[in-house]
From Swiss-Prot:
Pathway: Amino-acid biosynthesis; L-histidine biosynthesis; L-histidine from 5-phospho-alpha-D-ribose 1-diphosphate: step 1/9. The keyword Cell inner membrane does not apply. The gene is hisG. Feedback inhibited by histidine. It holds the Pfam family HisG. This is ATP phosphoribosyltransferase. Equilibrium between an active dimeric form, an inactive hexameric form and higher aggregates. Interconversion between the various forms is largely reversible and is influenced by the natural substrates and inhibitors of the enzyme. It is an enzyme of class 2 (transferase). Belongs to the ATP phosphoribosyltransferase family. Long subfamily.
């Protein structure tokens, strides 16, 4: 029996979001053993329980108030939301924040030897998918009627097996589609992982813990998107050097021992520093350019 005074978080047990969710919680300072194949894991240093479940169960657990928070792909969340609305329900939850992992796209794909001129060419076609409600929402907006073929796996083999004329499935590189004689023709939904919270009153202690986790998640995500930059630069070209680092705060300037013509610059940049930028910095006279990852960050 779960202790309802503890914060309950649902995450994917295995699959596309599992490793990234585990890493995010660990970097937020939650000490928990997720190596054992258990449904529930308990944090050692915080009043938090982690429920490890199938990804398509997570939205329902949050909407039904079984857990307090869930880490889930927006595609799965939106599909469950549309499913419940189609059944006359009024599902409620809050999206606390979009996360920086789990990026994917839900796309239409057709056999390589068939022409595609737009969604209208799918009129009255049979389309295999694991996301019937997202597919229907998209094609309804295009005034296209279709026949749905619901599959929970191996959707890409449907046309070759004679089960469907086209498919609607998640795509990353497109290699799986190509291996099955298909090509991506239309992106209908773009998704990332997100953190959601159940509706209803939250005890003050739990809400304080949620707020703390959100602050830490912001720090983790911001740190992953930022770099700590150190370099030496000519004193007379400081502003030119700074202008090449968009997103950077004003740098810390330190004198160099025995060299009054140059200074050391330290700064945090929220932008990716590409090789081209480093080469431009060097052309301005910068040297000893170091770009370092940031583990944690709090403004």
């Amino acid at each position: 029996m779960l202790d309802k005074t503890r914060l309950r978080i649902a995450m994917q047990k295995s699959g596309r979001l599992s490793d990234d969710s585990r890493e995010l919680l660990a970097r937020c300072g939650i000490k928990i053993n997720l190596q054992q194949q258990r449904l529930i894991a308990f944090a050692e240093n915080m009043p938090i329980d982690i429920l490890r479940v199938r990804d398509d169960d997570i939205p329902g657990l949050v909407m039904d108030g079984v857990v307090d928070l869930g880490i889930i792909g927006e595609n799965v969340l939106e599909e469950e939301l549309l499913n419940r609305r189609a059944q006359g329900e009024d599902p409620r939850y809050f999206t606390l924040r979009r996360l920086d992992f789990g990026g994917c796209r839900l796309s239409l794909a057709m056999p390589l030897d068939e022409d595609y001129t737009g969604p209208e060419c799918l009129q009255n076609k049979r389309i295999a998918t694991s996301y019937p409600h997202l597919l229907k929402q998209y094609l309804d907006r295009k005034s296209v009627s279709f026949k749905s073929c619901l599959l929970n796996g191996s959707v890409e083999v449907a046309p070759r097996a004679g089960l469907a004329d086209a498919i609607c499935d998640l795509v990353s590189t497109g290699a799986t589609l190509e291996a099955n004689g298909l090509r991506e023709v239309e992106v209908i939904y773009r998704s990332k992982a997100c953190l959601i919270q159940r509706d209803g009153e939250m005890p003050a202690e739990k809400q304080q813990l949620i707020d703390k986790l959100l602050t830490r998640m912001q720090g983790v995500i911001q740190a992953r998107e930022s770099k700590y930059i150190m370099l030496h630069a000519p004193s007379e070209r400081l502003e030119e050097v700074i202008s090449l680092l968009p997103g950077a705060e004003r740098p810390t300037i330190l004198p160099l021992a025995g060299d009054q013509s140059r200074v050391a610059m330290h700064m945090v940049s929220s932008e990716t520093l590409f090789w081209e930028t480093m080469e431009k910095l060097k052309s301005l006279g910068a040297s000893s350019i170091l770009v370092l990852p940031i583990e944690k960050m709090m403004e």
